[in-house]
């Protein structure tokens, strides 16, 4: 669907060019988040020329529609489609990539900006190699979602935290949670604010403001 802040504007598939453009031309918005798919990219392209953050959660397999309409027969052709999102990352931006998918990791070289990996396992080899070079990563360790830059680690929150536990019970996948955290961090949002945002997910703006004011003393 299509959301603006907490307002649900439409229930239909909003991944198309028209809905994306609708958000981009809205002067009341400071940021927008878009989801897309290989078919949408091939049929319409993306509504933006560059982006601050590009997230790739997995390398999809081809489908009969993609094969029939666009001759996407296998992994090599699919890579040329999915790389579009990474190609558009600004030099001052970041590509957020799933380190658990080797094909996604292979897109890192295409980013003009920083690369930030996420994985459930702190010992993921791609993630570990990235950290050895001073890179940033997000992962789970002893039940804590953890931020790392090189060998420096920050425990953000435990998966048992009330709101997180509830969302996971309702079907939120841990990989999605890690991608969300990594995206927020790549945008320069502080760990404190990321934690507060997740803790207060779905609450009204006034209540969130009160909680943040309380945290700031």
Language-model regions: role of each:
Residues 43-216:
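Acidic, Mg2+-coordinating active-site environments of NTP-dependent enzymes
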Residues 1-3, 205:
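Anionic-ligand anchoring segments at beta-strand to alpha-helix junctions in alpha/beta enzyme folds, i.e.
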Residues 3-48:
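Conserved nucleotide-sensing/catalytic segment adjacent to the nucleotide-binding pocket
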């Amino acid at each position: 669907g299509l959301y603006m802040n907490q307002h649900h504007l439409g229930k239909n598939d909003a991944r198309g060019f028209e809905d994306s453009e609708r958000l981009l031309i809205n002067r009341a918005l400071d940021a927008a988040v878009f989801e897309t798919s290989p078919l949408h990219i091939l049929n319409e392209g993306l509504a933006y020329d560059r982006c601050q953050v590009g997230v790739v959660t997995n390398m999809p397999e081809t489908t009969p529609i993609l094969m029939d309409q666009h001759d996407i027969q296998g992994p090599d052709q699919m890579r040329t489609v999915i790389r579009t999102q990474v190609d558009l990352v600004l030099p001052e931006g970041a590509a957020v990539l799933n380190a658990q998918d080797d094909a996604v990791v292979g897109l890192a070289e295409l980013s003009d900006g920083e690369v930030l990996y996420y994985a459930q396992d702190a010992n993921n080899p791609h993630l570990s190699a990235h950290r050895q070079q001073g890179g940033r990563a997000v992962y789970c360790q002893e039940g804590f979602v953890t931020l790392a830059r090189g060998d420096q680690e920050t425990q953000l929150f435990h998966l048992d935290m009330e709101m997180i536990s509830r969302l996971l019970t309702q079907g939120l996948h841990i990989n999605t949670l890690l991608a969300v955290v990594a995206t927020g961090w790549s945008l320069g949002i502080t760990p404190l604010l990321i934690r507060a945002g997740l803790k207060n997910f779905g609450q009204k703006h006034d209540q969130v403001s009160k909680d943040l004011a309380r945290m700031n003393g």
